[in-house]
């Protein structure tokens, strides 16, 4: 047969075919064409059922032309081993057969029909040959794969240079003009189909190319990746020939797995030097493919090796290299504290590390060291941490970033309340220490957070808690599951000023979601009294910061009262939980529903939990909490931002109030149903405070009466309707005011019905120590004791029941109280400046009844304006 179609003759279509098709025999060709004459195209077509239109004469003519004139070597006609038959070719390489069919059908129209046919055969032969080579190589592949064999790149390199050389191993291979095999680039992946010579050379000289470790070898070398790691999937990729190609842009051609395998040097930069942003940082992940691949993993290792384990556990060497794979990408693994990227990341700047309490890393002592050394203070100090310290917590509305914990903490810490507890304040405090003073004092949760603080302080190093950095949704969401349940409060603590209104209810959930460890860190179980003696310490430190108190209202400052022991049931939720303890207290106490926005304002510690305050006053152990009640003069603070239930925690003034009669800094009256604070935290009487809050200007004394009248209307309306903004403000205030007024009015009316109302009202009054909310006149003289005792017993229970419930009860009670107050207390709420005095007198008794702290209680009533 002429070499045209079957490649016979010295210059056969594919000299290499023989190598590939060693089984092909001339006899097979003879079968196809007796006499070994080149089959005509028609014959080929018939044999192949291609239905070639060419006639034998045409085919022969073309064959003769090509053989004699162009390719005399074909004239030999010596049958060369070739493809056995199209059928076999079909079986061996259907694709090649299809291509051959394509050309066989179109060759009639092609300028060089015979030549094209030859090329077609060559292509098919190449494909078949390639398959044969592959099979031959596959036999070697297991060994090659086991051994460091050239990776895809190396193979390509190996195959490329020798391509031009003839394959000596192919017996028929000669430098034939038509030996296209060596010159034709496989139409398929070159790596998949290296040229025959290249393949053979690569087989013999696999090491000739730059040896690239096989993926398997690297994987073997690499330390086992934690199950949490996602890289194993990458390893699968890497096993493939192109595994060396990174899913993302690889920093180096070297397998990125080395980085994960602790072969940090292979990484672009060592983990130590590289700013391992906490895996949670999405932007970081986007920037760092390695981290991106590892991020989900880092925390999922239950050890949260990133958290505590890195510390002592997996790779002490990488102890600070939080990237140590041994601690599978825990936060520590990434060296969050050290990570320069974190600071660059934004609000977490300055190695914000995490929200102090919530951040699994920052909270736990294991990380206390980690993050303490981290100059958290630098960034967190005043501005980076959520917001300037004066904003108490960050202005949560503007800087929700405490939810960094939401990013991490929630995922990391939420796994267990204990974890959160463990990672709790201690480290954070150390960071806080770096933070502005206000932040520090604020977190002066007595480290005694009972066991909470201690556990958070002490346990973190090992963080037995898996603290999966990635959310354990149940962990994150079920703050109640945590003994601390602080996540609830945490949410409140870090409620966003703007959003906090609705967060009162959502606060704990939010915190849970956020995984804020704050409440936990505050020691919810222990109640506010146990862990977070925020109020006493915090109000002073918190509000002591100039402008910190009044301003922080908006910023959902953590009020000391909030830390007050909320009902233990809420405690688990975390006293911080606005919905639960402190947060719920003020906002809830207020007509939270009436003023959803304010209601949302998370009364974090900043907002005294009236119930908590009352309760604490009852317990009288939370003196600091009382501080917040005492702080109430500071409550004027909340008048600074009337729109916000802006009562920060207890105020300095509150302390003054407890120490002596509070004097309105505006009208100098010492008699007022409710003490408020101006933005500076100076005590204002209810009238002045309300005026300031409503109008944003100091109440002109000349307008005092008018203002009071106006305010009274709005208060009554707000209480009833809570429609207008002022009304809403009033309503919020009224929640407390109602409490105070309600205590008189409600205590009469509510003693029977308002079991909840007095708690709501009273709790609101007590909890509002920081709030500007115009607490209605303190309980009437007669009513105070009645109200106080119901409040004492009932308020405490309602508080325990739940500030949120109080809020609702309060709302219902407010409606009742509204009517009662409108009739009786409506004026006294606003106007009660005068009535307040008798209540004030009664208030001490009331308060002492409730809290056993007369002056403190009195101030609590005054402070209820929060």
From Swiss-Prot:
UniProt-annotated stretches for the region Disordered: 1-89, 188-245, 260-287, 382-404, 562-663, 711-763, 775-854
Protein name: Nitrogen regulatory protein areA
GO cellular component, one term: nucleus
Gene label: areA
Keyword Metal-binding tagged: yes
Residue intervals of every GATA-type zinc finger in the record: 664-688
Amino acid composition bias (Gly residues), ranges on this chain: 1-12
Bilayer-spanning residue ranges: none
Protein source organism: Aspergillus oryzae (strain ATCC 42149 / RIB 40)
Positions with biased composition (Basic and acidic residues): 589-598
């Amino acid at each position: 047969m002429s070499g045209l179609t079957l490649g016979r003759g010295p210059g056969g279509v594919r000299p290499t075919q023989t190598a590939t098709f060693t089984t092909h025999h001339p006899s097979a060709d003879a079968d196809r064409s007796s006499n070994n004459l080149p089959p005509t195209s028609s014959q080929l077509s018939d044999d192949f059922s291609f239905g070639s239109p060419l006639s034998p004469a045409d085919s022969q003519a073309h064959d003769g032309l090509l053989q004699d004139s162009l390719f005399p070597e074909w004239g030999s006609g010596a049958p060369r081993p070739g493809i056995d038959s199209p059928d076999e070719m079909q079986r061996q390489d259907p694709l090649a057969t299809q291509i051959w069919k394509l050309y066989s059908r179109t060759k009639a129209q092609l300028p060089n029909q015979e030549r094209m046919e030859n090329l077609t055969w060559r292509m098919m032969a190449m494909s078949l040959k390639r398959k044969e080579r592959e099979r031959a190589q596959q036999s070697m592949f297991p060994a090659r794969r086991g051994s460091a064999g050239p990776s895809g790149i190396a193979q390509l390199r190996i195959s490329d240079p020798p391509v031009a050389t003839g394959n000596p191993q192919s017996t028929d291979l000669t430098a034939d003009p038509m030996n296209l095999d060596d010159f034709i680039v496989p139409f398929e992946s070159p790596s998949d189909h290296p040229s025959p010579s290249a393949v053979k050379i690569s087989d013999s000289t696999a090491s000739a190319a730059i040896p690239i470790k096989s993926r398997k070898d690297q994987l073997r070398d690499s330390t086992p990746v934690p199950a949490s790691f996602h890289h194993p999937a990458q390893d699968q990729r890497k096993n493939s020939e192109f595994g060396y190609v990174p899913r993302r842009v690889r920093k180096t051609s070297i397998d990125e797995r080395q980085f994960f395998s602790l072969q940090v040097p292979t990484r672009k930069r060592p983990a130590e030097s590289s700013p391992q942003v906490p895996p949670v940082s999405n932007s970081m992940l986007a920037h760092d493919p390695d981290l991106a691949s590892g991020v989900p993993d880092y925390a999922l290792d239950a050890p949260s090796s990133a958290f505590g384990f890195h510390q002592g556990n997996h790779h002490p060497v990488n102890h600070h290299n939080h990237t140590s794979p041994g601690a599978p990408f825990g936060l520590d693994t990434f060296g969050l504290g050290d990570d320069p990227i974190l600071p660059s990341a934004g609000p977490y700047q300055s190695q914000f590390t995490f929200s102090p309490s919530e951040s699994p890393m920052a909270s736990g002592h294991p990380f206390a060291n980690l993050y303490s050394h981290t100059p958290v203070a630098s960034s967190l100090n005043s501005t980076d941490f959520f917001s300037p310290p004066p904003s108490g917590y960050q202005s949560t509305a503007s800087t929700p970033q405490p939810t960094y914990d939401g990013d991490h903490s929630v995922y990391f810490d939420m796994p267990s309340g204990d974890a959160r507890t463990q990672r709790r304040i201690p480290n954070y405090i150390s960071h806080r220490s770096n933070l502005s003073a206000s932040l520090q004092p604020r977190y002066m949760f007595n480290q005694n957070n009972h066991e909470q603080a201690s556990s958070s302080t002490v346990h973190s190093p090992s963080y037995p808690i898996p603290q999966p950095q990635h959310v354990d949704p149940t962990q994150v969401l079920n703050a109640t599951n945590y003994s601390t349940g602080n996540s609830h409060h945490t949410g409140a603590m870090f409620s966003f000023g703007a959003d906090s209104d609705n967060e009162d209810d959502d606060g704990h959930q939010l915190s849970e979601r956020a995984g804020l460890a704050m409440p936990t860190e505050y020691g919810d179980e222990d109640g506010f009294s146990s862990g977070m003696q925020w109020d006493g310490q915090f109000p002073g430190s918190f509000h002591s910061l100039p402008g910190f108190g009044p301003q922080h209202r908006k910023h959902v400052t953590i009020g000391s009262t909030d830390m007050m022991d909320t009902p233990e049931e809420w405690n688990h939720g975390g006293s911080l939980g606005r919905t639960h303890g402190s947060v719920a207290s003020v906002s809830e106490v207020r007509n939270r529903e009436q003023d959803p926005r304010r209601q949302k304002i998370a009364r974090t510690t900043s907002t005294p939990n009236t119930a908590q305050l009352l309760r604490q006053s009852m317990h009288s152990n939370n003196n600091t909490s009382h501080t917040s009640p005492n702080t109430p003069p500071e409550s004027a603070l909340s008048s600074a931002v009337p729109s916000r239930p802006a009562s920060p925690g207890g105020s300095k003034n509150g302390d003054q109030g407890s120490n002596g009669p509070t004097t309105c800094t505006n009208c100098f009256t010492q008699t007022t149903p409710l003490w408020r604070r101006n933005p500076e935290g100076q005590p204002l009487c209810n009238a002045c405070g309300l005026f300031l809050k409503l109008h944003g200007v100091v109440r002109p004394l000349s307008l005092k009466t008018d203002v009071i009248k106006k305010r009274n209307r709005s208060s009554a309306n707000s209480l009833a309707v809570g429609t207008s903004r002022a009304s809403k403000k009033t309503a919020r205030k009224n929640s407390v005011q109602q409490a105070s007024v309600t205590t008189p009015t409600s205590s009469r009316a509510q003693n029977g019905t308002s079991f909840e109302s007095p708690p709501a009202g009273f709790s609101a009054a007590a909890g509002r120590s920081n709030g500007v909310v115009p607490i209605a006149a303190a309980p009437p003289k007669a009513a105070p004791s009645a109200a106080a005792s119901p409040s004492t017993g009932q308020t405490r229970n309602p508080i325990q029941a739940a500030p949120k419930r109080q809020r609702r009860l309060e709302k219902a009670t407010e409606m009742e109280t509204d009517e009662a107050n409108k009739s009786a207390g409506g004026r006294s709420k606003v106007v009660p400046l005068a009535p307040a005095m008798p209540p004030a007198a009664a208030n001490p008794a009331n308060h002492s009844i409730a809290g056993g702290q007369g002056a403190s209680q009195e101030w609590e009533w005054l402070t209820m304006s929060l």
